[in-house]
């Protein structure tokens, strides 16, 4: 999947389609901030894509 940068996401799989990661700011576990897609790199996403395919 490829959620645009800045859009809310739940995990990296949703953002890695366009080499972004799902970035969760500190405090996101408390529900104050939402995780959103942020710029990552191909190496990061290639590793994640293997996991995402299995999911």
Curated annotation (Swiss-Prot):
Keywords: Calcium channel impairing toxin, Disulfide bond, Ion channel impairing toxin, Knottin, Neurotoxin, Secreted, Toxin, Voltage-gated calcium channel impairing toxin. Disulfide bonds join 2-16, 9-22, 15-37, 24-35, 45-52. The keyword Secreted applies. Signal peptide: none annotated. GO terms for molecular function: calcium channel regulator activity; toxin activity. It is found in: Secreted. This is Omega-ctenitoxin-Pr2a.
